[in-house]
Structures are given as structure tokens and as C-alpha cells.
Amino acid sequence: MFYLQKILLPGAILVTLYVTFFAMRALRQFGLTLPTWGKWLTGLGAAVVVALCTVNRGVGTILLLHLVVLDALLRLVGLLFRKKGAKVWGRLWGSGALTLLLATVIVLFGYVNMYTIRQTDYTLYTDKDIREEGYRVVLVADVHYGVSLRDEQLQAACDRISAENTDMVILCGDIVDENTTKEQMEACFRIFGSIQSRYGVFYIYGNHDRSLPGSTHSFTPEELEENIISNGITIVRDEVLPITEEFLLVGREDEGYSGFPNDRLSAAELVEGVSQESFLLFAEHKPVSYGENAAAGADLILSGHTHGGQMWPINLFMAITATNDNLYGSMAYTDATTGIVTSGLACWGFDVKNAAPSEYVVVTILPE
């Protein structure tokens, strides 16, 4: 109710007003001046379009939002350079043609980009005493299954991952969410369970996977856990799992998950008694605890959650506010600790992703 009253409804009203004035401005460029009843009719039409986009939450919704943001930015550009080519610019902007063209191109790119899954490779060198051939780890996160990808597309991606012959695969949270049906959840983990790797597939919970009071999940946390485990996937939740004697996986509970029966352990508590001579691979859905993990001896931190911003201009806002320790990619947090954040295999909410690639990550860890 808070979301509806405080955010959604006021936002929809503002967008409706903007779309109304956008339409009337475009008509004026073609010499059409509306009478009062015509203006009201235009406003009603804008309200219907915004309402449909709000309820449907599809590509049209994203196109509409891009239209509004781009139009405002182009208006600002026109004000800054109004003395040069003002007449031509006024027609391009006033008619809405340039705005509509740019919005359409950006959204179409985002749609195609969403379904073009890439492999992103990183190489990390460590001074820890690990085997000469090193380790290869696949990182997958933020599938939000059911929003975009379907069974055959996910299977194709998993077949590509299997072909990499890696040592382990980490599913780093938000593989499913509140919009995933129970049938989709079951199919999703059946497909992920088919991945072939030397030491197996490991699961780290995210903030969307499990249901909370008031959520709309069609499966319980118990059903989710049962399906993950029954498909041969190992859940690593607030524990240290030895992959080999020299290579340890530290799986952290999702930060802030209130459905967990106990407060999550601190990074220091997790690695208490663990040899710092071993390579410590921390896996945590949200990249928000770099300092804590680094202090506990993390050599590498793998995360998801951010989607790389997913859509312009949201990615710019996320970069400016810096609510995460790392928005996307690889960064050296300290001389001893590296953090890698994936933009995710798919997306959340809408099947449009124009700020970052759809990807799975392959990390090669080698001795110096």
C-alpha cells in the first residue's frame, strides 16, 4: 500500500501530465491546435496509456519511461544551445520525432541485449600456495527466472557453461523470485543441476529467492530448498566449505534477509579457526560487505544483485549514490582482496537490459 500511495500513483500522475503536454506539443508542430475538449481527450488518452503500461509492466512501459527522460534531457540541450540551429532543433524536439527515435533505438537494443548471453572472463593471480593449474570458477546470478529466459534458452546457456570444464559453478542468488511460478522454479533448478563441473554447483541465496511475509511467491522456502538439493546443487549458507585443502568457499547468508532464523554470522565468525594460508573465496549476493570480508581474509569476493544498473539512466543513479561497494566488473578492493560483480544472466521486472550485458562469468585463479 505504501508503494501504491507514495510512489506508484504520484509517479503515474506526473508521467500522464508529461505525456499529455508531449502529445499537444507534437501536434502544434504540425499546425494543429486543440480545442479545450481536445486537450481533455488527449489527457484521457495519455492516462489510459500510462495505466496500461503501469499494469502490464512490459516493453511498452520501458519505452514510455525512456521517452519521458529523453524528452526532458533534449529539452535541456535545446535550452543550452538555443542560439544555434534553434529553428531546426525546435522542430525535431517539438515534434517528438527525435525523442521517439532515440527511445525506440535504446529500448530495442536493451531487448536484444537481454537475450544475447555473453561469457565474461577474468584472470586473478594469487600469492597463495595453490596448485599449478589453478582453479576455474563460473559465477551466475540474477536470472529471476520467468521474467525473460525460457527453458530452452537457459539450457543452452548451461550447456555452454558445462563445455567450459570448470572446477565449480556458483549460483550467487536471485535465480528465482516472486514472479517465478512453482513449475518454472522446478524446471530452472533441474536445468542448473545438469551443469557438469569438477566439484559441483553451489548455491548462495539472494534477496528475491525466498518468500517473506506479504510476498507473492508461489512456492515456500522449504519447497525451494528441496528442489535445489534434489537436483544435486549444494546450498552454502553462512558456512565454510572446503573445495580442496587449499581452496575454501565461504558462502554468506544474504545481508538483511529477515526470514533467516538467526542473524547471519559476521565474516570474522565464519572464518574463525580457518587457515589464512588457504585461498578464501567469498560468495555473497549483495556486494555491500567488502570491508568486512577483506578484513576476514577474503582473497576473492563474488557477487551479483546490482544487474550492472540494468537500465539507463538507473545505472547512472546507482553509480552516483554508490549504495554498493562495486556496481559491476572487477575491482581491487585492497592489495589482497579482489571483488567481482556480475550483471547477471538475465534481468528483473522487465526483459530490457541496456546498461550492462547478460552474462555468466568465468574466473581463472592462478598462482603468481
Feature locations, PLM:
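Soluble catalytic domains of enzymes that build or remodel membrane lipids, polysaccharides, and related
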Residues: 130-368
